[in-house]
Amino acid sequence: MKFQPLGERVLVERLEEENKTSSGIIIPDNAKEKPLMGVVKAVSHKISEGCKCVKEGDVIAFGKYKGTEIVLDGTEYMVLELEDILGIVNAGSCCHANSHDHKDHKHAEACCHDHKKH
């Protein structure tokens, strides 16, 4: 099933939590906390055509009580507002991480860094 987030939202699949502690103790499913990181599976048109700071495939960190959980085809996802994303794991700058040129920005003023500095 295809899902297209609206507004400034992203669809995220949570990363799996470890089943063992560092000392080897197995953690039962009901005792695990849900991870606060996930992989972006879809972004809204407003983000993909605007700031482009988050794209499909990015690993992001988000707040503990943020987003809305949904189930699509038996898989759990989170729908998060752009402002609820704390950061991108191993990210470069917006333009260079997304392989586009400054001249290609239609909405440079909405981007997450100052184009005049580059």
From Swiss-Prot:
Output a single Gene Ontology CC term carried by this record: cytoplasm
Gene3D superfamilies assigned to the protein according to its UniProt record, in alphabetical order: GroES chaperonin (2.30.33.40)
GO terms for biological process?
chaperone cofactor-dependent protein refolding
Reply yes or no: does the keyword Chaperone apply: yes
- Where is it localised? Cytoplasm
The protein's superkingdom reads Bacteria
Q: Which UniProt keywords apply?
A: Chaperone, Cytoplasm
Would the keyword Chaperone be found if you checked this record's keyword annotation? yes
The record's comment on protein family reads: Belongs to the GroES chaperonin family.
Please describe the quaternary structure of this protein: Heptamer of 7 subunits arranged in a ring. Interacts with the chaperonin GroEL.
Q: What does this protein do?
A: Together with the chaperonin GroEL, plays an essential role in assisting protein folding. The GroEL-GroES system forms a nano-cage that allows encapsulation of the non-native substrate proteins and provides a physical environment optimized to promote and accelerate protein folding. GroES binds to the apical surface of the GroEL ring, thereby capping the opening of the GroEL channel.
What is this protein's record name? Co-chaperonin GroES
What is the originating organism of this protein? Helicobacter acinonychis (strain Sheeba)
Could you read off the lineage of the organism from its UniProt record? Answer: Bacteria, Pseudomonadati, Campylobacterota, Epsilonproteobacteria, Campylobacterales
